[in-house]
Amino acid sequence: MLNVQRGLHTTVRLSARTKYTKPKPKPQARVIKSEPSQVTHHDNNLKIRAPIPPSAKNIVCPEDHPLWQFFADKKFLRDRADLDNHSRPWTIPELRRKSFEDLHSLWYTSLKERNILARENHLLKTAVESSDDSFEKVADKVRTTMWRIRHVLSERDWSYRIANEAFVEEVDSFVQEFEKDFLLLSQDEDEEAFEQLSRFQKSIFGISEFIDENVVNKRFIDGMKLIANLKVKKFSERNNDIKTFLDQTPNNKITDAGEAFLVFTCENTEKDVKEACEAVLELRNNGNAVSRYDELDTVAEYVNRLAQAQSQATQPVSEQSS
């Protein structure tokens, strides 16, 4: 019979590691021989130099720089002898004789001079620490001119408002009187008649001869209809077709904004007015009419289209092709 003794198995202990694994050596750095995919635009041969101390000589100011407007003849500070000490402010009667363009130019010239004097006076008080008030005296004279300009403009504004309020009550009688005089002018006086009509539509309704300068509002619509009817009545006495068209129109008066626009924009000749009347008859036969609720939007669109067509017609052929 075998005598078997129980014991511990030692295979695991004998197979166990007694040291850590030796680490692998680091790989050698690879040398990239290919060119970089992107080349920098900086210079690789830059050299560090000493800083340049700030100086006025290092600053180059362009001759057309806007800040030169605050300097008189590009001087840092004018002498007292360079100031206009012998002039006087503009008087109100003198300014009343000037046009709006002249007053506008004089205002901005005075404003520019006041800005120059304010800068020089500030330098005189702070940098130089002088008590000389020569610059302030000249500035006061310029300021007097400026408030007088505003006074004259205020007078004109109030005169315009008062005259406009008074004219509202007489505008209907004035329009009737002009219509009577306009239609009485003979065919030989057509040029003078339509010059008067142009001034009339500008003064009463604010309608310009240049279509792109107009603002379409109720005043424009009313003036457009009146001018269209005057043109039709003017030539109806000379052309039977136009007279027939006028007789077929209800109350002998064009009221549709689309119809009035056709006659209003045509040339002031018998032939063109006749063609416009024929176009209006075609619109009536097709049932095309503009509702009075859509007059403003529709006429505004007509005006924009006409202005674009005129601008394209005046462009050179090379610009249109491009």
Curated annotation (Swiss-Prot):
Protein's recorded name: Large ribosomal subunit protein uL29m
Cited Pfam families: MRP-L47
Annotated region (Disordered), positions in chain: 1-44
Cellular component, GO annotation: mitochondrial large ribosomal subunit
Disulfide pattern: none
Family listed: Belongs to the universal ribosomal protein uL29 family.
Keyword entries, A-Z: Mitochondrion, Ribonucleoprotein, Ribosomal protein, Transit peptide
Record's keyword annotation contains Mitochondrion: yes
InterPro entries according to UniProt: MRP-L47_sf, Ribosomal_uL29_mit
Main location: mitochondrion
GO molecular function: structural constituent of ribosome
Subcellular location: Mitochondrion
Quaternary structure (record): Component of the mitochondrial large ribosomal subunit. Mature mitochondrial ribosomes consist of a small (37S) and a large (54S) subunit. The 37S subunit contains at least 33 different proteins and 1 molecule of RNA (15S). The 54S subunit contains at least 45 different proteins and 1 molecule of RNA (21S).
GO BP terms, alphabetized: mitochondrial translation
Keyword set includes Isomerase: no
